[in-house]
Amino acid sequence: MNILFTSAGRRTYIIHYFQQALQGNGKVYASNSIYTYTLSQADGYTISPEIYNPNYIPFLIEYCKKQQITAIIPLFDIDLPVLAKNYDQFAQEGITLVVSDYPVTQICNDKWATYQFLLKAGLTPPPTFLTLPDTINALNTDSITFPLIVKPRWGMGSIGIYSVNNLEELNILYSKLKHDIWNTALRFESAADKEECIIIQQHIEGQEYGIEILNDLDCNYTATFSKKKIAMRSGETDIAETVDPTPFIPIAQTISSNLRHRAMLDVDCFISPSGQIIVLEMNCRFGGQYPFTHNAGVNVPRQLIQWLSGGETNHSLLTQQCGIRSCKEINPVIF
C-alpha cells in the first residue's frame, strides 16, 4: 500500500509514523513546497499545482496512478473541501481519500458554522457573534463581557487572533483584521462571505484540553484520546500531557454521531473553573495534537492502514496511556 500526504508541511513525524506502520509493505509520498524538509523524509515526493489551480485534481490523480498510490491523507485545512468535492472522482480510480464529506469540512473550516453545529448538538461553545452590532448589543445587555476574542471566521494556525479589552480595541482590531485577512492564505475561503469573515467570541477562562475523536472509514465512532495542553506555538500544541478521556467521551460521541466525520477529528476545548466543558473549535484531519497521543501508546496510522486494507478495528492500537508528557523539539536540519 502506498500513501500520499498533501500539504505535509512540518509534520515530518506523520511521515515517519506511517512508514513505521507500513512495516516495509508500502511507501509514503508527500507533496508541498520544495522548501519543506518533510519531503526529504518521504519515500517520494511531488510539487503539485496550488490547491485552487484547475489542474490540481487531475495532477494528483495522474501522480497517484503513476506511483500506485491507493490512499491520500490531507494535512491542511484548505485542502479538505477541495479534495472532498472530488471524492468520487478519486474513488473511480481506486484511490481512497481519507477525508470527511464536503459538508463536514465546511462545518469545521467555518468557525461560525462550527458554533451553530455545536449549539444544535446540545453542546456548549463560547458565545459567538458574526457582526459588530450584535456584539455591542450583547455587551450592552451584559450577555458577554470583555475580554473578547476577535478572529477570522475561516481561520487556521492562530493567524490574526486578537484579544480585546474594550470597545476601542474591538473596533480598531476588527477593522485591522478585516484588512489583513486578504494578505494571507485565509483570503481564499474568506471570499465566501467578504462582509462577515470575522467572528467575535467571549474569552474563556480555564484549562485548555485537546481531544481527538477517531471514527472509522464508514464514519462510525471508534475512540477518544485526550490531553491537557501546557504550551502552544503558532496555533499548535507544543507541550501536553495525556489525561483520562472518560470525562470527554460523552461529548466526543455526541460530536461523532452528529458530524459523521471520517477518521481523525481534532477538537479544542476548555474546562471552566466550574467544571463545564466548553468546545471551541474542530479540525477534521490529523492535527498538532496527534504526536502526544502517539507517544502515549496509540497507533492510529497502523489502524488506518488496517482499515484501508479491509481489516477490523484493533482496540489494542487505540488504548491511550495517561500521564505521558511530551513536547515538540525544534531541531535545525540541512536539506
Q: Which residues make up each language-model segment?
A:
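ATP-dependent carboxylate-activation loops
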Residues: 238-242, 287-303
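Peripheral (often C-terminal) accessory segments that flank ATP-dependent C-N-forming ligase machineries
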Residues: 138, 302-335
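Beta-strand scaffold of nucleotide-dependent catalytic cores
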Residues: 162, 172-174, 198-202, 208-228, ...
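Glycine-rich phosphate-binding loop of ATP-grasp-fold ATP-dependent ligases
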Residues: 125-128, 148-177, 208-210, 230-241
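A long amphipathic alpha-helix within ATP-dependent nucleotide-binding catalytic cores
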Residues: 232-279, 283, 308
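A conserved helix-loop-beta module that forms one wall/lid of the active-site cleft
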Residues: 92-160, 179-187
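Conserved ATP-binding module of the ATP-grasp superfamily
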Residues: 124-125, 167-204
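ATP-binding N-terminal substructure of ATP-dependent carboxylate-amine bond-forming enzymes
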Residues: 1-99
